[in-house]
Amino acid sequence: MTSTPGACLPGYASHFGLNNIPFGIASSDLHPNPQSVTRFEDNVIFLADIEALQEIKDLPPNTLSQPTLNDLAALPRSIHQEIRTHLQTLLKSSSLPSKALEPLASIRMHLPMRTPDFTDFSCSADHVLNASEAMTGSRSSPPSFYHQPVG
């Protein structure tokens, strides 16, 4: 699933500075394959284009080129912090490679994670019984709970 180009509206540049470096998945005409990105002000940074990040010792090759963040998210928090620290250093010194930087208007965003299975715990019998007890004082499920979906 993708959004249309420019769907990340400008005007929120102040939310994306050195202290807020989020990870996402994007593509563009120059980067046609969805891959890991971050946002800085009104620009998107394609992480796979930054050679300094490839030198991070425990970062497996091609992790930042994947079409989802699953592989990156599975890594220890220390790796995420190291990526952010490298990015902060590069941004402070204005030494990001130009090929990694694209204006927000040219970007297509993609779903960041592949989620093959999903369970909504709020639909479970345990949750329904706990919620019932919290609201009414007694543990009971609605008469229709086992016959139709909750929601």
Feature roles, as predicted:
Residues 2-28, 39, 51-151:
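Active-site microenvironments in enzyme catalytic cores
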Residues 30-33, 46:
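Glycine-rich N-terminal segment of FAD-binding domains in flavoprotein oxidoreductases
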Residues 33-39:
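A conserved glycine-rich beta-strand in the N-terminal activation segment of trypsin-fold
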Residues 40-45:
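Beta-propeller domains
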